[in-house]
Amino acid sequence: MSELSRFFIELGERWQRRWREARVFEPEPAPGVPKYFITAAYPYPNGAIHIGHGRTYLVADVMARFQRHLGRSVLFPMGFHYTGTPILTIAEVIAAGDKAVMEEYMELYGVPEEEIKKMGDPLYLARYFHGQSKRAMERFGLSIDWTREFTTIDPEYQRFIQWQFEKLRKKGLIVRGRHPVGWCPRHSMPVGAHDTKDDKEPDIGQWTLVYFTDSEGLTFPTATLRPETVLGVTNLWINPDAEYVVAEFDGRRAVVSRDAAYRLSFQVGVKILREARGREFVGRMVQNPVTGEWVPVYEARFVDPKVGTGVVMSVPAHAPYDYAALRDLGTVKLIPLIRVEGYGDYPAKEVVERMGIKSQADPALEDATKEVYSAEYARGVMREDVAERVGAHLEEPARSMLRAVFKMYFAGRPVREAREFIARWLTEARLGGVMYDIMNKPVYCRCGTEIVVKVLEDQWFINYGESRWKEAARELVKEMSIVPGEARAQFLATIDWLDKRACARTRGLGTPLPWSSGWVIESLSDSTIYMAFYTVVKRIRQFGIRPEQLTEEFWDFVFLGQGSADEVSKKTGVPVEALKAIREEFEYWYPLDSRNSGKDLIPNHLTFFIFNHVAIFPREKWPRQIVANGWVLREGEKMSKSKRNVLPLDRAVEMYGPDPLRATLALAAEVEQDLDFRDAEARRNAQQLMSIYTLAQRLVQGAEERPPTWVDQWLVAEISRVLERAREAYEKVRVRQAAVEVLYNAKAVFDQYLAMVEKPSRQAVEAAKAWAVAMEPLVPHLAEELWATLGGAGFAALAPWPKLRAEPAALLAKRYVDMLIEDVKNIPAFGQGAKRVVIYVNRSFAWVKAALAGDVKTVIGAGVPPQQAKKVVDLVKTLGDEMRGLIAAVDHFDELEALRSYRNYVEKALGAPVEIYGADDPAAPDLGGKKRVALPLKPGIYVEK
């Protein structure tokens, strides 16, 4: 640990202790005082929280602290998510004596060997990392109200979740039935993102199976995402070297890869009859079930047996990979199916040739495929004549009847409509079927088993596919604030594709499903409205209310205002006063003002949060904002346990100190961007914070009482502008921008000020106090130290947002002086060495005010001598927008007084003595004729070599 780190750690511990002793962050409802309620995703205590968690919590903490400065009563609570399998899986692995995992936990998280052995008990493991994570949050300086802390296996919380689920069930939003889910074969249970390694959400997709059949009745099921192209198939592909099986499923004998048979076995009954290599089936002829055509089976080593069924249909007119492969074989046959504006009859051939693709091994085929598939899906229309390709193998009148159906529902239809029709028709005609798969494979359970898709027959689901529920969720997404704004489209897209989701498991920690024994509510289903629980858990405990008293009537009254306190008290035994107090607490804090989490939770937790709020609560209690931040990299690489580069938050605090760590996480990227945490930047930021501390000491020790000078006024005005920009950044959750303003730009202003004065003034100390408040959301421990050092009363954390006045005249004076210095430096004689500089000031500021209109006649009418009028107008035109705005905001400006006030600064900048005269002073010498050429804001300058 460096001396610098030790300094900031000790500073942090001192102020954290004082906050704790004064209960600074434990708010009570304050009628008449505006509130702000913010939460961030509670962590799973299956390991130590790391700097990725730290970033999410920092953004929430910055927002919470800023809102306190605006005079709001702020609630920022935290709990711990024990539910589900993450904790249980790790405990099982440790209990089994897995040395690799045990060493990983000892190395990454610093777990002592004697402790790791006890972690085979899942509750021991959870409580260990619960405590460690809480300590890390405290040391990090989060302004959390710990009086509302809970875990998701606390009995009070379980009663709350059971109430929520009963509400959903009574609304018809929980159903039991058949549905595909991500599945861990080892544990025989559904899994979601929080059950997988790297929290990867299993993306369940649906293949359409098309049953091609050979002359012996053997079926070759191809798996496709584009069933509308089946009418253009010219051949099938099979990998000659891969392992295949002949198996019975769906009433057929079928050829599929061994891997496909395994995956299908979780969805339909599969009986393997024999094994074979793919080459056994190469050369066979198979019949297209839609057109009746016979097509060959070709070999292709590019076929992946782990994708689909391992049997692929080839459509060279509309699939670049197929076209390139058949061109290599010299057997291209093209059948046009889809018209797309901007393309000819054979889009695949056209794009392959345009891109100059020479072989099937060319990586550019990926881009070609994306282009063709995207264009055909977005703008493609099935050709009118495709129906004539249907049913050539059928006898009349069956052939004509089938073609009539295809003419009506397929030919001339947009691709997306044709796709839906033929997929449904193939299944209903038993000429095809459905196969589910993990489209973002491989996805692994935390136990290490690869996830598959299982079709569950008797599972409990939350039906996120219910249309009216979806519409209510869309309403909330459209009206709430979402940071970043571009994430709104992702929420709407997630709402569109969400369907039934398994909500209960048969193993793991959590809340029992209230109406069906043996089921435990899973982790992404018991974490959707827990923000409401924060508002009441403290009172429930204070009043000593037992879990069995937390009935449906209790929650209905507290959260929905249903029933009377007297009635509920009689049914539950909870005192009327307690019921009213708890109800009032909820009413004060809800709705939630901001929900903060990582962007990876948009496709699951955050969208479920939206759905469940609109289902349970009235509109006035719907959440107001979501903030979804980007990921955290470390030294340019994704953090992962396998790379051993995960940086636990507690260790990071130990390495850098809390404020340097906070500053680095704030400065590295804006909220929506991924953040690359670098050691060198953290150490540079620590030096910057120390220089701020040193500067404050210098201000206090050297400050003197004096009438404010132009330089003092400039400091106050400039800091006022910095703080205004910082406030705007905080309000927009532009955390990096706010950090740049208060930690770097404000420091630069103070540095410049101290370089211009011999001694700082009391006004400078007051400006520094304002600065301390503005930096408090980001680096609260340093801010408290500065606040106390500078004479601030109470805590900086509770100080109102500072109000400094930016006097335009003070800003104008500094800009004017800097312009003058630049003008002097641009004089050739100055560059040859100056003995002294003589400046003549024209004090006719009214001329410049008149010239803002830009009209010479107006300027002359204002009393400006005609020979000077055009010069003044031309001068004003050369000034920038900022300077012109300052001139417009100032009624009177004495250039001579301002310049004399800045004399020391000017002399330091020029490195030469400076003499200053009024151009209207008859006693002033006119050196080089410069006295008479002086204009307002454009002094006459004489350089003596």
UniProtKB/Swiss-Prot annotation:
Residue window of motif 'KMSKS' region: 638-642
Catalysed reaction, written as an equation: tRNA(Leu) + L-leucine + ATP = L-leucyl-tRNA(Leu) + AMP + diphosphate
Subcellular locations according to the entry: Cytoplasm
Keyword set, alphabetical order: Aminoacyl-tRNA synthetase, ATP-binding, Cytoplasm, Ligase, Nucleotide-binding, Protein biosynthesis
Gene Ontology biological process: leucyl-tRNA aminoacylation
An example Gene Ontology CC term for this record: cytoplasm
GO molecular function, one term: aminoacyl-tRNA deacylase activity
InterPro entries: aa-tRNA-synth_I_CS, aa-tRNA-synth_Ia, Leu-tRNA-lgase_arc, Leu-tRNA-synth_Ia_arc/euk, M/V/L/I-tRNA-synth_anticd-bd, Rossmann-like_a/b/a_fold, tRNAsynth_Ia_anticodon-bd, Val/Leu/Ile-tRNA-synth_edit
Keyword field contains Protein biosynthesis: yes
Binding locations of ATP: K641
Cysteines paired by S-S bonds: none
Subcellular location, principal: cytoplasm
EC number: 6.1.1.4
Group of enzyme by EC: ligase
SUPFAM superfamilies per the UniProt record, alphabetical: Anticodon-binding domain of a subclass of class I aminoacyl-tRNA synthetases (SSF47323), Nucleotidylyl transferase (SSF52374), ValRS/IleRS/LeuRS editing domain (SSF50677)
Motif range ('HIGH' region): 43-53
HAMAP family assigned to the protein according to its UniProt record, in alphabetical order: Leu_tRNA_synth_A (MF_00049_A)
Family the entry assigns: Belongs to the class-I aminoacyl-tRNA synthetase family.
Name of protein: Leucine--tRNA ligase
UniProt lineage: Archaea, Thermoproteota, Thermoprotei, Thermoproteales, Thermoproteaceae
